[in-house]
Regions:
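A short, hydrophobic beta-strand element within the central beta-sheet of small alpha/beta folds
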Residues: 74-84
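Conserved acidic segment of CheY-like receiver
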Residues: 1-10, 17, 49-50
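Conserved phosphotransfer cores of two-component systems
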Residues: 42-43, 69-74
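A short, well-structured beta->alpha microelement
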Residues: 8-10, 17-44
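Conserved phosphotransfer microenvironments
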Residues: 35-36, 45-68
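Short acidic, S/G/P-rich loop/turn micro-motifs used as interaction or catalytic elements
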Residues: 10-14, 51-60, 83-86
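Alpha4 helix (beta4-alpha4-beta5 surface) of REC/receiver domains from two-component response regulators
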Residues: 84-99
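Receiver (REC) domain switch/output surface
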Residues: 109-122
Length: 122
């Protein structure tokens, strides 16, 4: 079973993902960047984070990704952008995050298919 953390500022989507039998959603939808690190400190065996650029926090995105990867180098990250942002996409790709989707172009069913296709070393 894939352990998934959501930090998408969308509690409804988090609840819908919890209904999927193949996933274990860890906690509630995270509402700020630093909470991601707090949860990973307690539970580092999470397989996948679904992360949105909308998540507020003091830590810069690049530093957050760096810290996530230090805590769990095998973790996969799906990143949801609000709109096309080439500068942010370049930062994500530089940090080996290639699963980048746009909020207005992805729905729950598509997200579930993407998660099911993700190769996760368990």
């Amino acid at each position: 079973m894939k352990k998934i953390m959501t930090a998408i500022n969308n509690p409804k989507l988090n609840e819908e993902l919890k209904k999927e039998k193949k996933f274990e959603i860890v906690g509630k939808d995270i509402q700020y960047k630093e909470a991601i690190l707090e949860i990973l400190e307690k539970n580092s065996n999470i397989d996948l984070i679904i992360l949105s650029e909308k998540i507020p926090g003091e830590i810069k995105l690049e530093k957050l990704i760096e810290k996530i990867k230090l805590m769990n180098e095998k973790i996969k990250i799906i990143f949801i952008l609000e709109k096309e942002n080439n500068d942010l996409a370049k930062i994500l790709i530089k940090n080996n995050i290639t699963d980048i989707y746009y909020n207005n172009k992805i729905n729950l069913n598509e997200l579930i298919k993407i998660i099911n296709k993700k190769e996760i070393n368990m």
